[in-house]
């Protein structure tokens, strides 16, 4: 075994955590040559359930899984980690305002940011999954000033996968034939799934799909509202598909991107495409396996700019609501 990675997962006994841990342990995230240690963080009352998950992980006898531990002590869970997968957050409840949700989770992610800075390995990278993930990542990052800003990501990969599937189904092709799908902005109902730069079998999606009214209307709204549609159908939020997107996102970060393609995740803005510096904003990204860069130079037309500005403004509003938590 040539490499080993220590991974912290918060909210490990929850539905996303349950769907995620076995895939990390099997090697799907970091590849067949990388051993894994899992350090799980859970609330005290969820420790028994997390121990049950560990029993199942043991019973899988994964060759790549060297060790699993669970703790309600954040310093223990984050000690010497190379990756922090921040899955756990407080979900929005009936009657709760967005500002309330931001502040409740803000306290959690303030603590987690400080603990990452204090305990993690010097090469730590962080993917925030718990919603509202862009602003949760912003809060954690600003409370861990010693961790470089290019190590922080929030997940828009589920939106990318949803968009790819919608385009593939409309075009009558396989999802593997769809590439270059960018999700701009916030992981929320304001996100902008960009079909103008997307490709189907290497051709512009707008050439392959002639129904441009669908692209500008139902395509965007379906992707934006897919999470709510799943809750309505299933009675619970996306879990397996979210876990799958976590695997995809980390794999895309640590693996060289196919030439000419990109993947979507939110990261720290340095002003690219006119976005406020310091926001955690959804961009198209490419990786050389070590360093991740924002794909620049893409055209955003007047239609796209209108959508782009809506999601940009929402993220600025969220930042303003939590400004007292930004270190």
Curated annotation (Swiss-Prot):
NAD(+) binds at residues 11-17, 105, 112, 129-131. It comes from Leptospira biflexa serovar Patoc (strain Patoc 1 / ATCC 23582 / Paris). This is Malate dehydrogenase. Substrate binds at residues 92, 98, 131, 162. It comes from the Bacteria. Its EC number is 1.1.1.37. Coiled coil: none annotated. InterPro entries: L-lactate/malate_DH, Lactate/malate_DH_C, Lactate/malate_DH_N, Lactate_DH/Glyco_Ohase_4_C, Malate_DH_type2, NAD(P)-bd_dom_sf. One of its GO terms (molecular function) is L-malate dehydrogenase (NAD+) activity. GO terms for biological process: malate metabolic process; tricarboxylic acid cycle. Catalyzes the reversible oxidation of malate to oxaloacetate. The active site is at 187 (proton acceptor). It is an enzyme of class 1 (oxidoreductase). Keywords: NAD, Oxidoreductase, Tricarboxylic acid cycle. CDD domains: MDH_chloroplast-like (cd01338). It catalyses: (S)-malate + NAD(+) = oxaloacetate + NADH + H(+). It holds the Pfam family Ldh_1_N.
């Amino acid at each position: 075994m040539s490499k080993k990675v220590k991974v912290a997962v918060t909210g490990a006994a929850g539905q996303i955590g349950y769907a995620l841990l076995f895939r990390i342990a099997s090697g799907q995230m970091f590849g067949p040559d990388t051993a894994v240690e899992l350090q799980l963080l859970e609330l005290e009352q969820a420790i028994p359930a997390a121990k049950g998950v560990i029993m199942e992980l043991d019973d899988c006898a994964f060759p790549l899984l060297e060790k699993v531990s669970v703790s309600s002590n954040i310093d223990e869970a984050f000690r010497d980690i190379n990756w922090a997968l921040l899955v756990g957050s407080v979900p929005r409840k009936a009657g709760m305002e967005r500002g309330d949700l931001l502040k409740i989770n803000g306290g959690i992610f303030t603590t987690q940011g400080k603990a990452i800075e204090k305990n993690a390995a010097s090469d730590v990278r962080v993917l925030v999954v718990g919603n509202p993930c862009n602003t949760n990542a912003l809060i954690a990052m600003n409370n861990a000033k010693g961790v470089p800003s290019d190590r922080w990501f929030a997940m828009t990969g589920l939106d990318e996968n949803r968009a790819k599937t919608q385009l593939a189904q409309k075009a009558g092709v396989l999802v593997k034939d769809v590439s270059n799908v960018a999700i701009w902005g916030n992981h929320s109902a304001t996100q902008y799934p960009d079909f103008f730069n997307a490709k189907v079998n290497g051709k512009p999606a707008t050439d392959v799909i002639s129904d441009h009214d669908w692209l500008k209307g139902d395509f965007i709204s379906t992707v934006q509202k897919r999470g709510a549609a799943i809750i309505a159908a299933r009675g619970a939020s996306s879990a397996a598909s979210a876990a799958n997107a976590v695997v995809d996102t980390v794999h895309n970060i640590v693996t060289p991107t196919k030439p000419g393609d990109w993947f979507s995740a939110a990261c720290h803005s340095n002003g690219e495409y006119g976005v406020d510096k310091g926001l955690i904003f959804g961009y198209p990204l490419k990786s050389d396996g070590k360093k991740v860069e924002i794909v620049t130079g893409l055209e955003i037309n007047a239609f796209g700019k209108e959508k782009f500005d809506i999601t940009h403004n929402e993220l600025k509003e969220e930042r303003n609501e939590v400004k007292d938590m930004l270190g």
